[in-house]
């Protein structure tokens, strides 16, 4: 089974599992001293606290847990740097970085079918589900039928709000031993999943990253090479009937156009600067 099928099976059978994506932003934050004051494509700043958290999270999740998958960035040189952090590289469970992201190459074959099945399985799970994401992903709560949603800022939340987010999650989980926590909250998600795994070793923790951006906000935040109609039709069988209710959701689309995917072009970034008064 590939990683999509593994996660689907684990969720169906309530087997503890996690998936965390380590991309170029996480790499630069963790390893590049010259980038210690830099930022990723979402203008999420690299900080020492985040750097230390990412390094610890990678070590812990790959060496101390049994069913934790690491979304592997496409550049093998970056993955070699991560491998250099640990003693036993054979314990690293590398997986497809785009496990939750629908690629243009997925359309028309079983890859798309399997990914929609994964989302369907999450949606149908009766585990208590909590999402951590920015407020424009409000529709994600309907997509996966989560019990709670915790909103964080679009970027730069980790240093000041990490402990607060952990406490909020603990409050919502209550006495449950096996929660499902879904993250779409940038680089800090990796550290969040690590700490939650320590607290709830029976839990299921899934790092969606930018995967839900397009279908939930109509904003192609990463340059997916397909249209909104394409992704909407792919998800249509599991979407609620009011998915396009403008009264309920109409305000999020314009805001998403200048707050998400701002690295894709100067026009979007200029709209963003105008919005914040700079």
Task: Show where each model-derived region lies.
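Structural signal for conserved beta-strand scaffold positions within catalytic alpha/beta enzyme cores
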Residues: 19, 72, 150-153, 207
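C-terminal functional extensions of proteins
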Residues: 184, 188-278
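Conserved nucleotide-cofactor-binding alpha/beta core module
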Residues: 132-176
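Electropositive, gly/pro-rich neighborhoods at or near active sites that engage anionic ligands
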Residues: 1-146, 277
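Surface-exposed alpha-helical segments enriched in charged/polar residues
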Residues: 59, 167-170, 194
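Residue-level detector of flexible, active-site-proximal loop/helix-junction positions
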Residues: 77, 156, 212
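A structural signal for short coil/turn segments at secondary-structure junctions
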Residues: 65, 173-176, 200
């Amino acid at each position: 089974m590939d990683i999509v099928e593994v996660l689907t099976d684990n969720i169906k059978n309530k087997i503890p599992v996690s998936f965390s994506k380590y991309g170029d932003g996480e790499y630069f934050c963790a390893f590049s001293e010259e980038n210690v004051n830099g930022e990723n494509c979402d203008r999420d700043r690299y900080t020492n606290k985040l750097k230390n958290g990412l390094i610890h999270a990678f070590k812990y999740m790959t060496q101390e847990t049994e069913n934790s998958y690491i979304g592997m960035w496409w550049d093998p040189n970056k993955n070699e740097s991560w491998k250099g952090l640990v003693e036993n590289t054979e314990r690293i469970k590398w997986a497809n970085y785009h496990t939750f992201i629908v690629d243009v190459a997925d359309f028309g074959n079983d890859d798309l079918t399997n990914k929609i099945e994964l989302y369907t399985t999450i949606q149908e799970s009766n585990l208590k589900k909590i999402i951590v994401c920015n407020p424009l992903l409000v529709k994600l709560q309907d997509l996966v039928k989560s019990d709670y949603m915790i909103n964080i800022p679009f970027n730069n939340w980790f240093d000041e709000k990490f402990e607060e987010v952990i406490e909020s999650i603990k409050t919502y989980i209550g006495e449950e031993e096996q929660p499902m926590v879904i993250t779409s909250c940038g680089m800090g998600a990796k550290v969040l999943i690590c700490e939650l795994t320590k607290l709830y070793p029976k839990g299921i923790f899934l790092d969606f990253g930018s995967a839900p951006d397009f279908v939930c906000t109509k904003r192609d935040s990463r340059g997916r090479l397909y249209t909104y109609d394409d992704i909407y039709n792919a998800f249509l069988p599991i979407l609620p009937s009011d998915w396009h209710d403008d009264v309920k959701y109409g305000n999020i689309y314009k805001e998403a156009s200048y707050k998400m995917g701002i690295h894709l072009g100067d026009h979007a970034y200029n709209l963003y600067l105008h919005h914040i008064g700079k």
